[in-house]
């Protein structure tokens, strides 16, 4: 039986989330809802407690959204690095101290470096590591690159 486009895309994203959660976060991150949504000017985003859980009036789940407009124009490693970038936001929300909405603080930047992504407002070496609108680049031979190579 052929896999549907929905099953293939969401299954791949969920498999990647599970792999990087184990490899980079020691399996500490909770399950979340991964969505595919267009969001102008962003490769992805994180939203805490975004959706109610089916069958519960009080429980919520966090969302990691990936922008499909950028899937074809970037390498699989770059796309997966966006997923991990958003996973760092989830980590900070659950285990750290977030700053104001959309601000990427020093704690976030330190965790990014720990998982093998270098924060940069330009997406290249030499950029600011904290701020409102942030990107990153992949650390050569860092934890993310090693985990990506075995995925």
Give residue spans per PLM region:
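Metalloprotease/metallohydrolase-associated module, dominated by Zn2+-dependent proteases
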Residues: 2-74, 94-151
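Active-site recognition of the HExxH zinc-binding catalytic motif
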Residues: 81-94
């Amino acid at each position: 039986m052929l896999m549907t486009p929905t099953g293939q895309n969401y299954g791949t994203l969920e498999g990647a989330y599970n792999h990087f959660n184990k490899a980079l976060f020691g399996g500490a991150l909770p399950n979340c809802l991964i969505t595919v949504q267009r969001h102008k000017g962003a490769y992805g985003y994180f939203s805490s407690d975004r959706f109610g859980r089916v069958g519960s009036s009080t429980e919520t789940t966090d969302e990691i959204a990936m922008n499909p407009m950028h899937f074809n124009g970037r390498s699989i490693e770059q796309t997966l690095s966006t997923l991990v970038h958003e996973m760092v936001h989830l980590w900070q929300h659950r285990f750290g101290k977030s700053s104001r909405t959309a601000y990427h603080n020093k704690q976030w930047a330190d965790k990014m470096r720990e998982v093998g992504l270098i924060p940069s407002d330009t997406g290249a070496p030499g950029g600011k590591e904290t701020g409102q609108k942030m990107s990153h680049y992949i650390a050569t031979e860092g934890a993310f690159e090693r985990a990506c190579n075995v995925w």
